Structure formats: structure tokens, C-alpha cells
């Protein structure tokens, strides 16, 4: 066990990030289990502890008697300095065991700009970065999460990649590891990887060869062995009603980003927003019943003492039994001062009655996501809402006592013009004027938050070349010039960070050396504006003979092989191409959840179904139309 000396620990910010011992944390004697796992998250404690996936994995592994999972997060700059000064290796929170002593180190990957933190954590742990330099004396490196659907830029660092939902997959892998470990890994590391590659949803990068053309374009990625699958199909949980859910999560000692109980209403989203990668990755929609959700809420509140429950899914307001669930939660917790919160809502799903109910305990502003300023642009991205929808929702809100509205938009979308940007300012002014008209007061406020569009894999825009950073900055200045009212605040994201994110989002294996060079030059916590160094990143690319524009700004041909083609989210390329063509013509595609099948291919490919409770009972939609 690593000893933490208070003589120096008191000099770092928030030492509770590193001490462990939180309520509901689980400590096991490593000598009594067969498999030890460190769950890594490449960001600071407050961000990592807010992530539901970590909570699920932590509870999932620790419910087994033969395994233990402990947590490890990226140390903040001051803590890293102290650790390096004192030769303290990266350690787990629960038992302060050096990370290199675990059997498995499993990272959750949410964001491309956290990749250098992975390298920094490996270096602090004394673990070689490249998989080829590690034998079984070191932990097996595993990763999962949305970035796994194009893991190629970091594939050289990882041994095993989990594609899809990991509850069943994790148990299968632990069982195999336990059995092979007991036999002494007779086939060595490669032999074990060939066996684990047989588990559906498993990608082992070392078992594949990558080929490029003479011009330097990606050509193919092929398995090195006949028993290794050419493509890896994602795993899903069909029965989300009864799947494991963490009702006894670790309660942190310090404030974290999302410090509350979380209810996952359903998985998947079929709204079909064309910019949205998550809506493609997590199909099909599978709901939990209100009764199951109420029980989860009761257990979690009893086990944690939280005073807030967040209703979380990709589009929470689309939950078919939302009014009933809210009534059940409010009745259960009405005398316990436990509030219920909803994230940003789709405008067409908004119910002022629900909003009023959930804010009986604590009242806050309302958040909507029109995404674009004009109807043409909203149709292009398949948002499927109108200005009338937004103004009607705001009218109801203002009449019911709300004074604050936050609006989310995106900038740099395909076919976007300055007229579309002007529409953002126009909408903000209309909402503000509406408040004054309804209330007769001038205390209304509108927050306009505009992000820089990053094309992502497995979406209809995966072929689209991102707009030039200087053009984005021009657009940001233009929009700012149109907003001149102290009651409208305007926030926008840095274009340079989005540029690097796009390069890694659509990158190939050659980018691993760029990451190493950038890390050597001091890059880490790149998702934090104050630590991102654009010039250092450009130099890292140049030193490796690569250009970020090749990955971020280049529009691909439909027939061009893509570095992530072998990582199958089961949404067909034909469907994505059809959606691109629909976007160019500004045509809408309906939601297959309550309309005819749109032919994305997920349900028949996975032999599964949409699970919805709209009609009162469980409805499994299993008919398919388009191919």
C-alpha cells in the first residue's frame, strides 16, 4: 500500500481526490480474489465520479466474490508534481495499490481530448505505453465507451477493446481471464488475446494488420489469424429491465460535477439527429418500467442520502411513461425534500406540467436544444422541431413563472450559411421579447450556448469535412455582433480544440505517435481550455509527418475505406449514406420508435427489438421495412 503523507498532501488542491475511503467504497483483500481490476478514467476525480458507466462497472465487478475493482483517475497537476518528486507510482483509491500490480487496467473513453491523459497515467504507473512492449507481467489494458467505435488512433496502446454495452461482456471476459490465469496462460499473451477475441464485442488490435496505399491513404485492416473476426459487432443488453444497476454508488467526499442519484430511463435513441453519434451507436431504444425505476430510486436514495434524482437518457423527455414516473417519484419523496431534475429537453417533448412538478422542491432555469437557427437548417440535421414549437414551450414556461431559458445550438454544420447564424440571434431575441410580452417585466434572461460541430464516425456526417477554424472564428464573431442585449448571454467553444477533436475522431493508427509526441511536449488535460496548447499539437503532427487537416477537414468519398469500418455499431453504411442524401435535400426522416421502420439495420442485425411502454404495456417492435 502506498502511504500518503499529510505533510505534503495538504499542499495539493482537494486532497480528498486521492484519499479514498468514501461511503459505499468497496475494499477487498487482493489475496482472496482471482482477478484484480483497476477502473481508469482519464480525467480529474470530479469528472470521473460523475460518470454512470464507472459506477456500473464498479458495482458489476465487485458483486463477484472472485474479483475486485478499484478506481484510478487522472491526478491533477499539483498532485502529479508531488508524485513525480517523491517517486510515488499511480495508485488505486481503495487500497492504494500501485496500478501496475493489477491484472487488468480498464479505461472508459468518453472524449478524444482525454487521450494524452491515458499516456500520462500509464507513465505515472510505470506501465509501458505500447501494447507490444508489455507482457503478462503488466496489466492487460482494456477500453470501452463511445471512443471505442474508432479506437484506431489509440489502438497501439490497448490490448482489448469492448464494443457496446459491457454488463454481460465483462463477466464473460473475467471468467476467461480467471480460467487462463489459473492455467498459467499456456498460450502467452497472444494466445489469450486470440481466445478473448472469440467473445462477441471484443476487438484486439494486435491481432490485425493495417495497410495503407502508396499515396498514404487508409486501405484496409485485416485479421492476422483465421479464427479472429474480420469485423467486430457491438454488444447490447436486450433486457434492460433486469440488468444490473448500481443502487449503492460511492458517495464522494467533495463536490463533483453531477453529485446526485441517477436514473437511466432507457437506452438508445431513434430520433435520428444527423449530427449525433450517440443516437446511432446506442440503438435500439429499450425502456425500463416506471415500477423498476421507482425501486432503483428508492434504493439509491436510501443507500446514499442524496437529495436529488436526475432522470437521464439520450432524450429523457421521450420516455413513454414520463408523466406517470414523475408522479410516482414526487409522491414517494414529497416529504423527504428530494428533488427530481431533467436535462435539456427536446422542444416537442416539453410538458410544462412535468416541469412544474419536478421543480416543486428546487426551481431552476429551463434548457432547450433547437440546435440551429432556421427551419431549413433544423430540417437538414433532422431535428424535427419548429420555431413555433420553441415559442409555444417558452410561452407556457413564462406563464408558469420561469424567467430563465438556456438555448443550445451548433455552428459549422453542413450547408450552414450566415442566414442560419442570424437565425440563432433572431430566436434569442424572440424568446426574450416573448417573456416581456407575457410578464410585462424585464427580468427575463436567455443564454445562448453554441458549440463547434465535430463530425463523428458512424453518423450520417462521418464523411463530412469540418469547416476551417478561421471560418468558425469568423462565424463566432459575426453571431456575437448580432447579440447586443445584456439579458442575452452568448457562450461559444474554442475552435482549435474542436479541430483536434475532429482529427482524432476520424483518425487512424498513425496518430498514436502524434499522441506520444504531444504528451512528451507537455500536453495533458487537453479538454480543459486553460491547458490546451494548439501550437504544441500542430508541432506534434508536423514532427510525425502528418497533417490534422487530412483527418478533420477532408470530405471522404462514399466508397472510400474508413479506418473504423471493422468496428460495427450495426447501423448500415447504406442507411447513413441515405441520411446524408436526405440532409442535402433538407428532408426529414421520422422516428422509427413510433413510425414505420427506417431501415437502419440494427434490430434485424442484432435480432432484437425496440421496447416501449407507450400503449400501456410492453411493446416489442420487431417488424422491419426498408433494407
Regions flagged by a language model, labelled:
Residues 7-38, 45-46, 205, 211-262, ...:
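N-terminal [4Fe-4S]-dependent radical SAM core
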Residues 39-42, 113, 299-406, 410-447, ...:
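Conserved SAM/AdoMet-binding glycine-rich loop
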Residues 1-15, 64, 604:
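Helix-enriched interaction subdomains in cytosolic or periplasmic regions
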Residues 37-43, 58-61, 250-275, 301, ...:
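N-terminal pre-triad scaffold of radical SAM enzymes
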Residues 51, 255-291, 599-616:
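Canonical Radical SAM [4Fe-4S] cluster-binding loop centered on the CxxxCxxC motif
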Residues 77-78, 153, 209-213, 320, ...:
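Flexible glycine/acidic-rich beta-alpha junction loops that bind and position SAM and/or redox cofactors
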Residues 74-222, 460-508, 516-531:
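Glycine-rich beta-alpha loop elements in corrinoid/cobalamin-binding modules
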Amino acid at each position: 500500500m502506498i502511504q500518503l503523507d499529510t505533510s505534503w498532501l495538504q499542499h495539493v488542491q482537494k486532497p480528498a481526490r486521492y484519499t479514498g475511503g468514501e461511503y459505499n467504497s468497496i475494499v477487498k483483500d487482493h489475496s482472496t480474489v482471482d482477478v484484480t481490476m483497476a477502473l481508469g478514467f482519464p480525467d480529474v476525480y470530479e469528472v470521473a465520479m460523475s460518470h454512470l458507466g464507472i459506477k456500473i462497472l464498479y458495482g458489476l465487478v465487485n458483486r463477484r466474490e472472485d474479483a475486485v475493482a478499484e478506481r484510478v483517475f487522472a491526478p491533477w497537476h499539483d498532485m502529479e508534481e508531488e508524485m513525480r518528486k517523491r517517486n510515488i507510482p499511480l495508485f488505486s483509491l481503495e487500497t492504494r495499490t500501485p496500478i501496475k500490480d493489477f491484472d487488468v487496467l480498464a479505461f472508459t473513453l468518453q472524449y478524444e481530448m482525454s487521450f494524452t491523459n491515458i499516456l500520462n497515467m500509464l507513465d505515472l504507473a510505470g506501465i509501458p505505453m505500447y501494447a507490444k512492449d508489455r507482457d503478462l507481467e503488466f496489466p492487460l489494458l482494456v477500453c470501452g465507451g463511445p471512443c471505442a467505435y474508432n479506437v484506431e488512433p489509440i489502438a497501439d496502446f490497448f490490448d482489448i477493446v469492448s464494443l457496446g454495452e459491457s454488463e454481460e461482456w465483462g463477466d464473460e471476459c473475467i471468467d476467461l481471464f480467471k480460467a487462463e490465469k489459473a492455467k498459467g496462460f499456456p498460450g502467452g499473451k497472444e494466445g489469450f488475446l486470440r481466445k478473448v477475441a472469440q467473445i462477441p464485442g471484443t476487438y484486439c488490435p494486435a491481432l490485425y494488420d493495417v495497410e495503407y496505399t502508396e499515396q498514404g491513404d487508409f486501405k484496409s485492416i485485416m485479421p492476422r489469424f483465421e479464427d479472429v473476426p474480420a469485423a467486430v459487432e457491438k454488444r447490447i443488453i436486450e433486457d434492460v429491465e433486469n440488468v444490473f444497476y448500481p443502487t449503492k454508488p460511492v458517495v464522494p467526499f467533495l463536490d463533483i460535477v453531477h453529485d446526485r442519484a441517477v436514473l437511466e430511463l432507457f437506452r438508445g435513441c431513434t430520433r435520428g439527429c444527423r449530427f449525433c453519434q450517440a443516437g446511432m451507436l446506442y440503438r435500439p431504444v429499450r425502456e425500463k418500467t416506471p415500477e423498476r425505476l421507482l425501486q432503483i430510486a428508492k434504493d439509491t436514495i436510501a443507500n446514499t442520502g442524496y437529495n436529488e434524482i436526475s432522470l437521464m437518457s439520450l432524450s429523457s423527455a421521450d420516455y413513454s411513461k414520463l408523466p406517470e414516473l414523475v408522479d410516482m417519484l414526487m409522491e414517494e419523496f414529497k416529504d423527504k425534500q428530494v428533488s427530481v431534475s431533467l436535462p435539456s429537453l427536446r422542444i416537442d417533448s416539453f410538458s410544462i406540467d412535468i416541469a412544474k412538478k419536478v421543480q416543486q422542491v428546487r426551481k431552476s432555469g429551463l434548457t432547450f436544444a433547437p440546435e440551429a437557427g432556421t427551419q431549413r437548417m433544423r430540417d437538414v440535421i433532422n431535428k424535427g422541431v419548429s420555431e413555433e414549437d420553441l415559442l409555444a414551450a417558452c410561452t407556457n414556461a413564462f406563464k408558469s413563472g420561469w424567467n430563465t431559458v438556456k438555448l443550445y445550438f451548433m455552428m459549422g454544420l453542413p450547408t450552414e450559411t450566415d442566414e442560419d447564424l442570424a437565425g440563432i440571434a433572431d430566436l434569442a431575441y424572440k424568446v426574450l421579447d416573448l417573456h416581456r410580452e407575457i410578464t410585462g417585466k424585464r427580468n427575463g434572461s436567455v443564454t445562448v450556448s453554441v458549440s463547434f460541430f465535430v463530425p463523428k464516425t458512424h453518423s450520417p456526417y462521418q464523411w463530412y469535412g469540418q469547416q476551417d477554424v478561421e471560418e468558425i472564428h469568423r462565424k463566432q464573431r459575426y453571431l456575437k455582433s448580432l447579440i447586443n442585449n445584456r439579458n442575452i448571454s452568448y457562450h461559444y467553444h474554442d475552435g482549435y480544440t474542436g479541430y483536434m477533436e475532429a482529427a482524432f475522431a476520424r483518425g487512424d493508427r498513425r496518430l498514436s505517435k502524434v499522441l506520444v509526441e504531444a504528451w512528451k511536449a507537455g500536453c495533458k488535460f487537453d479538454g480543459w481550455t486553460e491547458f490546451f496548447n494548439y501550437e504544441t499539437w500542430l508541432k506534434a503532427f508536423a514532427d510525425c509527418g502528418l497533417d490534422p487537416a487530412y483527418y478533420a477537414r477532408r470530405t471522404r468519398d462514399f466508397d472510400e475505406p474508413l479506418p473504423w469500418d471493422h468496428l460495427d455499431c450495426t447501423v448500415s453504411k447504406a442507411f447513413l449514406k441515405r441520411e446524408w442524401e436526405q440532409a442535402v435535400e433538407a428532408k426529414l426522416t421520422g422516428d422509427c420508435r413510433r413510425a414505420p421502420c427506417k431501415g437502419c439495420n440494427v434490430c434485424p442485425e442484432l435480432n432484437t427489438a425496440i421496447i416501449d411502454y407507450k400503449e400501456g404495456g410492453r411493446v416489442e417492435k420487431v417488424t422491419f421495412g426498408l433494407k
